[in-house]
Each structure stands twice: as structure tokens, then as C-alpha cells.
Amino acid sequence: MTRFLASIKDIDEAKIASTVDIDIIDLKNVDDGALGFVGIELVSKVKRLLPNSILSATMGNDLNPNNNMNIKNLKMVIDKEINYLKIGFFDNAYLSEHEHILKDINFKNTQPICVMFADKDFNLNNVEKLIAMGYSGIMIDTCYKNSKSIMDLLTQKEIKEFLKI
């Protein structure tokens, strides 16, 4: 199955997206690193503009997602009934912090998605651990957008193993 995800950074792009058949509209501050958070105001505006669209939001670039500001943002975005929240897994040292937020936050109907980075502390052994903690899905991305692609960074064996999980 092929699906189309389009990242948007502002309300003007959301208006354009409203005229096109897009499977998932991803709210992302592209000027703020790999998973820049657009802010709750834009999340609210886009949800009002596109109430029937499938929306995802990147939740920022915190190494430790279990911090007061991120938890506050997560809860506000969940209250807006966004379909998917993308939370970055930037550092293996913070694996247990992901478990804490997944257990402590009521995600209601919002699905938390863990974003692992092929070019930053990637460890295939963590995929099953992250799913067991409560992530609804795992995706692989690149953290440094001007570096190599996922196909350059991971072996075919790693990609096949990831797809089997």
C-alpha cells in the first residue's frame, strides 16, 4: 500500500493541502531540526481548517522527551485530537524516559509514533522495546537532512529486519 504524507509548516501550506488528496498531513517546523514542533496555535488552526483530515505532528527535538514542556505540548496536541504524534528517539540513554511518558500520558485516540534516526544512535534492538513500551508504530528517518539517505546509512539486512518486526 502506498500512502502520501505531506509535511506542512504554516497555515498557507495547510490551505494548499486542503485542495489536494493527501493521506496524512504532517505538521512540522522544518526550520527547527528533524522534528521541529510547530506550536499549539498552528496545530489548533490546522485542525479547524482540516477537521476531517488525518493529521500528525512532530513534537520537537528533545533528547529527553520526558520534560515538563514536552509533556505539556503532548497533552495539548492530544486534546486537539491529532491522529499521530511523532516523538524522536535521539539517544539510547533516554530509552527509559520514553517508557515513562508512554505510561504517564493518556493518549486517548492519538497514536504515538517513535521516530528513530538512521544517522543518530540507531539500534535495531530498540524497535521491539519501544513497541512494547506502547508506541503504536516506529518510523526511521534521518536527523541530518543534508547527510546521507536511510538507504546509505542502513544495510539491506537491517532494513529487512526492521520490516519483519
Report each predicted region and the residues it spans.
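Catalytic cores of alpha/beta
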Residues: K9-V20, M59-K80, D119-M133
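N-terminal entry module detector
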Residues: M1-D31
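Conserved, mostly hydrophobic/aromatic
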Residues: A17, V46, I138
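Active-site-adjacent beta->alpha loops and helix N-cap segments on the catalytic face
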Residues: D31-P51, P65-N70, F89-N109, K120-N125, ...
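Hydrophobic faces of well-ordered beta-strands that scaffold small-molecule active sites
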Residues: F4-I8, I25-L27, L55-N61, N83-I87, ...
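N-terminal-biased segments
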Residues: D23-A34, C114-A132, S136-Y144
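Alpha-helical scaffold elements within enzyme catalytic domains, especially in hydrolases
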Residues: I16, L49, M76, D104, ...
